[in-house]
Amino acid sequence: MGKKSKVGKSRRDKFYHLAKETGFRSRSAFKLLQLNRKFQFLQKARALLDLCAAPGGWLQVASKFMPVSSLVIGVDLVPIKPIPNVVTLQEDITTEKCRQALRKELQTWKVDVVLNDGAPNVGASWVHDAYSQANLTLMALKLACEFLCKGGWFITKVFRSRDYQPLLWIFQQFFHKVQATKPQASRNESAEIFVVCQGYQAPDKIDSKFFDPKYAFKEVEVHAKSVSELVSKKKPKAEGYADGDTTLYHRFTLMDFLKAPNPVDFLSKANEITLGDGELENHSSTTEELRQCCKDIRVLGRKELRALLNWRTKLRRFLTKKLKEQAKELDINLSSGEEEEGREEEEKTSPKAAADEMVKEEEEEVELALAEMKAKELAELKRKKKKILKEQRKQRERVELKMDLPGVSIADDGDTSMFSLQTIQRTQLLNEVARGDMASADALLEMRPGDDDICVSDADDEDDVSLASDLDPEELVEIEARQRRLERERREQGVKRVKPKVEEEEEEEEEEENPLLVPLEEKSVLQERQTSLWFGKDAFAGIEDDADEDLELGQSQMLAERQRESQTGKTKKKGQKKKVPQESTAAEPQDAADTGADTAEAEAEQSSDDDSSSDEEGPPTPVGRKRGLVEPCGFEVVPIEDPVKKARVLDAEGLALGSVIATSKKAKRDLIDDSFNRYSFNEEEGELPEWFTEEEKQHRRKQIPLDKQTVEEYRQRWRQINARPIKKVAEAKARKKRRMLKKMEQMKKKAEAVVSTVDISEREKVAQLRRIYKKAGLGKEKRQVTYLVAKKGVGPRVRRPPGVKGQFKVVDSRLKKDVRAQKRKEQKKRRK
């Protein structure tokens, strides 16, 4: 007895196991995943309808890849287990009840994507099953045409049968682009294929015959055409003959051929060319073959016609040369313009130009086809590039949020290369190797600042680039101000010790040494050997003979240093102070270059220069005058500059007086002379009462002769300057304006999104726009109050007078006096 095996066991392929692992309810979910990966229709969809959705694998994929708060509806004959954010209906898609249920769920919305993965119960016969599936697809298309928005997508499953081509033709009537594809998840032995219809046209009227299976799948008998039907019965239109042309045989002379403006047209009309002129007939270019070709032009091919055109060009050049010689003999100047014009005509009428035109037309057609293909490829590449950039941005965000630790990602960052001792340069790296794989992750967490959200140090500037890119301009301004304040506080706390450059170089050399690589010789022996090899060259042969000169130079340098110290001591006695720098010179390479041994060399060089020029320029200037002095303790002392005198602010009369002094020497001299008068030595203002001096100012002071117009101009300038806001007020106004503009842009984007939404009614659009404007603060308008002056005898209640709209307030003279008295009381309180 044979062993019976289960059929379902053989169908459990890799997609079946993947569905089990990932939590999808069916392996067909990977079909939709692969279709979406190719066409990208789920990412932009806001509403989706899945027909024949059980058990819900496609609904799971749709809810995962569609935007948040999207509407997803699934319909099937059998119940579907609940899925988060998905509406499921148990209806038959071929009934009217299903349409009513969908209208109730969608209300005024239109869906962007309609999916159909339905198939009938198979098993009777292949012909019957294929027809049932095509009929089911036609019903799904009917629902899609009712609920799809313009430009929507329709993805359906179709069996390959004789009803496949009629279905494709119907799809092409409703959609701009129809493509048939078979995803990898679909089994090879299955007859199913998926048709992706893109760009729903949304016609105003649809003929019901499109959705009638009897009409749509009706077999059309193609009658065999007879031979008489294949032959065209239409006669060609008679073009006729030229006016006055009574013969069909045209004979022309050679001169007519040479004078013809268009030689190609001339050859198409001519039957024979007669060679009447003996000189042209006996020309060297006139061969026997050309003579025979001229006798019957209608039988010539392209090669012979081209030879005739080249022959014509040579004869025309010969005639042009002959005419020039005759003109010289008769002292007639032949215009070069006619010759150039003739050459242009020859170039235009050459057979090469006619052949090039045909080639150009073919090339243009090929170029157009290539351009279309390139445009499609570029669009596809842009789409893929955009997707890759989006994934990279998400990965950066995960790393910044510390969601991914280094070493966890699969990408090869160079850590998987072969181990080498050369790569370990410091003891810290050695400790990390000893700790294991997670040492780099711990080091990264230790390096991250935990106390402050914003890192001010220069070493972490690169880490803060991504943070700064996500902040608003206002927040960036606040961060920069905070950074400057922190740097100022750090400078005021104390002075950092300056390390000499030589010590820094020694430390760098010690850090660069590899702790795991041991040299064969000691360091001192190796340095001495390298030094002896370097100074053993011929260029340093006479350097020992100059030892006496080096001694003299050293003594002169010491003398110059003593003179400089005495100069600095004198300046200290005069009261010049030294100032400690706010910032460490180690942060600036230029200042660091002046410290340590390099400073001594620079001072020695400058002292020698000062000695050489001391006779001409006087005593040498101290080195620390501009750059500051570097003392042996390592601190840089900078002298304090003289305080800048505060400029005197002149009033309008003072500015007018200054303009008179600057423009005229005579007026300046007169003003100086007039300044000596009996009011020059008045008593000081502090000795007399204030009220007395204020009263006597206008009588005990001589008026300066100034132009009133000039004084008024300067007063107007002062008014304009005083009208300007201070810097803080201007910055505050600018920030407020920038916030308002930003809020306006956000509001405009939201309003445009609401207006462009097709799925809501106009009433809902207006309500949403009002809410947006109200939230932005644009709907609040300041009420205008109308003031009415009350007459005597008016009671407390006043009726609205005619012609006054809106809010009004009744005022009288008593109220005006009360307000004035209240203001006076407030001023007295302020004075106290």
Curated annotation (Swiss-Prot):
Chief site of localization: nucleus
Biased composition (Basic residues): 570-579, 822-832
Binding of S-adenosyl-L-methionine, residues: 56, 58, 76, 92, 117
Residues in coiled coil: 726-758
Annotated transmembrane regions: none
Biased segments, Basic and acidic residues type: 345-358, 485-495, 811-821
UniProt KW S-adenosyl-L-methionine keyword: yes
Catalysed reactions, as listed in the record: a ribonucleotide in rRNA + S-adenosyl-L-methionine = a 2'-O-methylribonucleotide in rRNA + S-adenosyl-L-homocysteine + H(+)
SUPFAM superfamilies attached to this UniProt entry: S-adenosyl-L-methionine-dependent methyltransferases
InterPro entries recorded: RNA_methyltr_RlmE, RNA_MeTrfase_FtsJ_dom, rRNA-MeTfrase_E, rRNA_MeTfrase_SPB1-like_C, rRNA_MeTfrase_Spb1_DUF3381, SAM-dependent_MTases_sf, SPB1-like
Keywords: Coiled coil, Methyltransferase, Nucleus, Ribosome biogenesis, rRNA processing, S-adenosyl-L-methionine, Transferase
Places the protein is found: Nucleus, Nucleolus
Record GO biological process: maturation of 5.8S rRNA from tricistronic rRNA transcript (SSU-rRNA, 5.8S rRNA, LSU-rRNA); maturation of LSU-rRNA from tricistronic rRNA transcript (SSU-rRNA, 5.8S rRNA, LSU-rRNA); RNA methylation; rRNA methylation
Chain intervals for the UniProt region annotation (Disordered): 332-358, 485-523, 546-631, 795-832
Compositionally biased tracts (Acidic residues): 503-514, 600-618
Pfam families: DUF3381, FtsJ, Spb1_C
Enzyme class: transferase
Active-site positions on this chain: 157 (proton acceptor)
Its biological purpose: RNA 2'-O-methyltransferase involved in the processing of the 34S pre-rRNA to 18S rRNA and in 40S ribosomal subunit formation.
Family in the record: Belongs to the class I-like SAM-binding methyltransferase superfamily. RNA methyltransferase RlmE family. SPB1 subfamily.
Protein name listed in UniProt: pre-rRNA 2'-O-ribose RNA methyltransferase FTSJ3
